[in-house]
UniProtKB/Swiss-Prot annotation:
Keywords: Aminoacyl-tRNA synthetase, ATP-binding, Cytoplasm, Ligase, Metal-binding, Nucleotide-binding, Protein biosynthesis, RNA-binding, tRNA-binding, Zinc. The gene is thrS. GO terms for molecular function: ATP binding; metal ion binding; threonine-tRNA ligase activity; tRNA binding. The lineage of its organism: Bacteria, Bacillati, Actinomycetota, Actinomycetes, Mycobacteriales. GO terms for cellular component: cytoplasm. It catalyses: tRNA(Thr) + L-threonine + ATP = L-threonyl-tRNA(Thr) + AMP + diphosphate + H(+). Catalyzes the attachment of threonine to tRNA(Thr) in a two-step reaction: L-threonine is first activated by ATP to form Thr-AMP and then transferred to the acceptor end of tRNA(Thr). Also edits incorrectly charged L-seryl-tRNA(Thr). This is Threonine--tRNA ligase. Binds 1 zinc ion per subunit. PROSITE patterns: AA_TRNA_LIGASE_II, TGS. Homodimer. GO terms for biological process: threonyl-tRNA aminoacylation. Residues 1-67 form the TGS domain.
């Protein structure tokens, strides 16, 4: 009935199932785990498609088990948990209509058309109901609808599901709606009571799902919010419930602890507390304003990056924020990215005194990307092979129309500044240039204190690409070699590339283990053709350059938010808006500290003295909360000895440090761009 491809049973080991036998039955024969974190929740066939354990192959087939504690396993658990949630909502709130409920990163959500917004008390009530459903061990049964009419009849009381059924075949495979409909059969999943055999609840869904609700060992509802049907503000308003589900109670608790820490580190909260930036309603959603404190941090970030780029051979350019629409027609952005662009402005039109149009207005757009303008710089004159590689770099502000529901502080904004580079090189230079770019990216990110990375390689979507198979295969092979040489973990992203070329993305883990996509290195076979970019080769012939898109931070704003959360607001001294604060024990010692901070300012250090009326202990508390890395205290003994006392954010202290020594320690710490917070332990070695 089934046999393992290798010798001993293993929850990750492929096995073969005989035609006509259910996968789950074959697994039981092999004694693969059905409980605990390694319980097999579904399988993956030879084409990479996830299948229910109830799946019956028509011919002998190989399958790979998917344990609960893998990313695929967790995704299936979370998707199944959305069905449990929706069943609970319709039981507790009769008359509720169902939207969609996909698994998302670290959790899930489900949208509902309900009379009133959900309250925290409602979520508690729903969790209790869900636990009862899980305890029942309801079976997930997949049923194929024989026709659209049959599906419509089954879901006749669910208007949003009916819309999805009628849209079958026209849904973006990458959208949340694709969870329920897409290519292949039109299917539903029925939750069957194991005791009575009766259907307790059902939903339109493609699956796969866990065998029974008992395979959902740990979950929690986290919050609710307003949402729009299919993410469109012009459509019906819905209520969304978010949750998370894991393979064990221990994994759930670990995640909840991480989320509690993440909440403390939320850059939006820290931005307000530390007076770094704000989002004024008068300006509009998704447009941050940096205050003086945040402006200093941003300036330091940009200046260090600028110096590193100059040393690495990049040429700085600058381009305008808006341009004629014809440029984005030429680049293809209006064909492929129009939904992500702000509406056009009509400019340059003229009318006479009688209102007759003398000159037609033209469409101008706020730029969503810098690359078309960089191509115009390349094409502004003839180029020789001797000029290549040509590396054009810009801190270029771009504007993208993000839906209001996805805007998230600095990490998902509508207006942001990219550290954007476009590199033009010959085919022979490509591998060396990619190696240099990747080394430069990792080195620069480490300068800012990130040091835990892995790479993701996005390869060709066979249904959506430009250029020949040969050039895709060759360039993908080069990217893979470059990534492998870096020594970093390489994770494949099959068919994940944009249509114009393969891509490497650099993923960074922060201080609490979260992953952020930081940098991208993208090959482009499309724009050099569209812009007819050429250079003169050594034999005098005209050739097309290869183009590399490269954004290191992604955007300055996003990177600012990532660093703010990574450091929990306590930026390294070289980035901190206030590097040194003088705190006198009494007012009479302020003059001594003014001299010390004056000498520090002469050395380029941001230093000042707190001369407020607050008591010393309150000043220490205030500046500890304000995350000032160096606090210098001075009392009678310090003044007499021409010394200061160090106070650090961790509460430790070093007393009686001579002023010259203190200034040397501080300037050395800052100029070396030390990313650790100073403390008694680390500074005492330098005193």
């Amino acid at each position: 009935m089934a046999h393992l491809i290798e010798a001993a049973p293993n929850p990750h080991q492929p096995f073969v199932v005989t035609a006509g036998v259910a996968v789950g039955a074959a697994m039981r024969e092999l004694e693969l785990p059905n409980k605990g974190p390694e319980a097999i929740v579904c399988v993956k066939d030879s084409e990479g498609t996830l299948r229910d354990l109830s799946f019956v192959p028509e011919q002998d087939s190989k399958f790979t088990p998917v344990p609960a504690n893998t990313e695929d396993g967790r995704t299936v658990i979370r998707h199944s948990c959305t069905h449990v949630l929706a069943q609970a909502v319709q039981a507790e709130f009769p008359g509720t209509k169902l939207g969609i409920g996909p698994a998302i990163e670290n959790g899930f959500y489900y949208d509902f058309d309900v009379a009133e917004p959900f309250t925290p008390e409602d979520l508690q009530k729903l969790e209790k109901r869900m636990k009862k459903i899980v305890k029942q061990g309801q079976k997930f049964e997949r049923r194929i609808f024989a026709s659209v009419a049959e599906a419509e009849e089954a879901l006749k009381n669910e208007p949003y599901k009916l819309e999805l059924i009628r849209d079958k075949g026209n849904v973006d495979p990458g959208s949340d709606e694709a969870t329920e409909i897409g290519a292949g059969d039109l299917t539903g999943y029925y939750n069957v009571n194991p005791r009575t055999g009766e259907v307790d609840w059902y939903d339109l869904c493609r699956g796969p799902h866990v065998p029974t609700t008992k395979y959902i060992p740990a979950f929690a509802l986290t919050r609710s919010s307003a949402a729009y049907w299919r993410g469109d503000q012009s459509l019906a308003g819905l209520q969304r419930i978010y949750g998370t589900a894991w393979e064990s109670k221990e994994a759930l608790e670990e995640y909840q602890l991480m989320m509690a820490e993440a909440e403390k580190r939320d850059h939006r909260r820290l931005g307000a507390e530390l007076d770094l930036f704000s989002f004024p309603d008068e300006i509009g959603s998704g447009f941050p304003v940096f205050h003086p404190n945040g402006g200093i941090v941003r300036l330091e970030m940009e200046e260090h990056s600028r110096r590193r780029h100059i040393n690495a051979g990049y040429s700085f350019v600058n381009t305008p924020h808006i341009t004629k629409g014809d440029l984005f027609k030429k680049s293809g952005h209006l064909d492929f990215y129009a939904d992500g662009m702000f509406p056009p402005m009509q400019l340059d039109g003229e009318v006479d005194e009688e209102g007759n149009v003398v000159k037609q207005a033209q469409d101008y757009y706020a730029k969503p990307m810098n690359c078309p303008m960089h191509n115009l710089i390349f094409a502004s004159r003839g180029r020789s092979y001797r000029e290549l590689p040509l590396r054009l770099f810009e801190f270029g502000t771009v504007y993208r129309y993000e839906k209001s529901g996805v805007i998230h502080g600095l990490t998902r904004a509508r207006g942001f500044t990219q550290d954007d580079a476009h590199i033009y090189c010959t085919e022979d230079q490509l591998e060396q240039e990619l190696t240099s770019v990747l080394d430069f990216i990792i080195s620069l990110l480490r300068d800012y204190g990130l040091d835990d990375f892995y790479l993701e390689l996005s390869t060709k979507d066979p249904n959506k690409f430009v250029g020949s198979d040969e050039i895709w295969e060759k360039s993908t092979s080069i990217l893979q070699r470059v990534a492998t040489k870096s020594g970093l973990e390489l994770v494949p992203d099959p068919a994940g590339a944009a249509f114009y070329g393969p891509k490497i993305s650099v993923q960074a883990r922060d201080a609490i283990g979260r992953t952020w996509q930081m940098s991208t290195v993208q090959l482009d076979f499309n724009l050099p053709e569209r812009f007819n970019l050429e250079y003169t080769s050594s034999d005098g012939s005209k050739k097309r350059p290869i183009m590399i898109h490269r954004a290191l931070f992604g955007s300055i704003e996003r990177f600012f938010g990532v660093l703010l959360e990574h450091y929990a607001g306590a930026f390294p001294a070289w980035l901190a808006p206030h590097q040194v604060i003088g705190i006198p024990v009494a007012d009479s010692f302020s003059e001594h500290l003014e001299k010390v901070t004056g000498m520090l300012r002469d050395n380029g250090v941001r230093a000042s003295v707190d001369t407020s009326d607050d008591r010393m202990q309150k000043k220490i508390r205030n500046h500890t909360t304000g995350k000032v890395p160096f606090m210098l205290l001075a009392g009678a003994r310090d003044v007499e000895a021409n010394a200061v006392s160090f106070r650090f954010l961790d509460g430790t202290q070093i007393n009686g440090v001579p002023v010259d020594k203190a200034i040397g320690v501080i300037t050395q710490w800052i100029s070396s761009r030390n990313n650790k917070q100073p403390s008694e332990e680390t500074v005492k070695k330098l005193v």
